[in-house]
A protein has these predicted regions:
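N-terminal intrinsically disordered, cationic/polar leader segments
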Residues: 4-14, 20-58, 65-66, 70, ...
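Glycine-rich phosphate/pyrophosphate-binding loops
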Residues: 94-111
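Hydrophobic (often cysteine-bearing) scaffold residues that line and stabilize catalytic clefts
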Residues: 81
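A short interface-forming secondary-structure element
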Residues: 76-78
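Alpha-helical support elements that line or immediately flank enzyme active sites
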Residues: 84-95
Length: 146
């Protein structure tokens, strides 16, 4: 999480970053670069139970819950997908379950991802979001039982 920023503020930063990129080749290069900056997930987390179902590529997603905030770590075996999940981690990690559940994630449309991604990759992106929100729902349920 970008310290003390709302989900919407981080989304706006990403939209601003993409606004400087003129072509889709440049945008894809930037997405690849974002993926390269995402720390590699430790091998012990790269197991079947941490894979995101519905992605053509292999995506591993793990979550932790500390001090009322959900933190995500992720990785992928392809550079574009790793870049996509890195943006989601950047936007959603470090927020409360309610903030994650309620997040509209408008940046995905605003930077053109829904119209420029192949259908399979777009489906994978939706699956990643669904998994991240499912973790948040689970942690919210835990809050109520504690």
């Amino acid at each position: 999480m970008e310290e003390n920023k709302t989900i919407q503020q981080v989304e706006e930063e990403i939209i601003d970053e993409f606004s400087f990129l003129e072509s889709w080749d440049e945008k894809y290069e930037y997405i690849i670069d974002l993926g390269k900056r995402l720390p590699d997930l430790e091998e012990k987390y790269k197991v079947e139970e941490n894979t995101v179902k519905g992605c053509q590529s292999t995506v591993w997603l793990v979550a932790s819950y500390e001090n009322g905030l959900v933190h995500f770590k992720a990785d992928s075996n392809t550079v574009i997908t790793k870049g996509l999940i890195s943006m989601l981690v950047r936007v959603l990690s470090g927020h409360t379950p309610d903030e994650i559940i309620d997040a509209k994630l408008e940046f995905i449309d605003k930077i053109g991802m829904t119209t420029h991604l192949a259908q399979t990759r777009s489906n994978g992106l939706r699956a990643m979001v669904k998994n991240m929100k499912a973790y948040a729902i689970g942690y919210k349920a835990m809050q109520k039982t504690v």
